[in-house]
Swiss-Prot record:
Residues 197-207 have a biased composition (Basic and acidic residues). Belongs to the eukaryotic ribosomal protein eL15 family. Keywords: Ribonucleoprotein, Ribosomal protein. Gene3D superfamilies: Ribosomal protein l15e. GO terms for cellular component: cytosolic large ribosomal subunit. It comes from Desulfurococcus amylolyticus (strain DSM 18924 / JCM 16383 / VKM B-2413 / 1221n) (Desulfurococcus kamchatkensis). One of its GO terms (biological process) is cytoplasmic translation. The keyword Membrane does not apply. SMART domains: Ribosomal_L15e. This is Large ribosomal subunit protein eL15. The keyword Ribonucleoprotein applies. One of its GO terms (molecular function) is structural constituent of ribosome. The lineage of its organism: Archaea, Thermoproteota, Thermoprotei, Desulfurococcales, Desulfurococcaceae.
Amino acid sequence: MSKSMYHYIAEAWKEKSRELEALIRQRLIEWRREPSVVRLEKPTRLDKARALGYKAKVGFIIVRVRVRKGGQRKPRPDSGRRPKRMGVYGYAPAKSLRLIAEERAARKFPGLEVLNSYYVAEDGRYKWYEVILVDPHHPSICNDPDVNWICEPQNRGRVFRGLTSAGKKMRGLRKSRGLRGTVYYKWKRKLKERELKKRHEASRGARDPWQIAEKLKEEK
């Protein structure tokens, strides 16, 4: 069976030959000097953009967004406390960098809606994503049966309500194997531990779970 052009583009990005790595390195030098949100004429990864719903017609816009890597930069407090309680290290946002990039693109272009996004490149300090934006008021979008669902009022501001692909992944709504690593699962497990007075610093010296269970039986 013959393979399409998009297959070979995807294979080139997957293997990343020396020529492609040199091209990406040269592009990163230019991208660092640009603003954090830049509108593009065409997508960098055509195969990925097409797979996520992009079409080369009026109403579709591609935006490249630069996001800083790592967790939150918390200011170190001046007042005295234990280093453990400084609240400087170990604080990471619950949102993924990809979702943050989508929200920044939506704020830059408030009249457009986010369709999807994909990863492009990264260095030691930044990550670059390309976001596919759609004009929900354009006739070419409203008359397209593939994407006219985004013109409906319930999809307004969908990126800020966690309705994009990155937002659903952050909320733990993926229906597949390996959901034990989601934010919701970890929160649920931590909630059970706190109910049982386990591994919770505020309950040092508290009774063991079996003692609590015995007391509940006596009260009944």
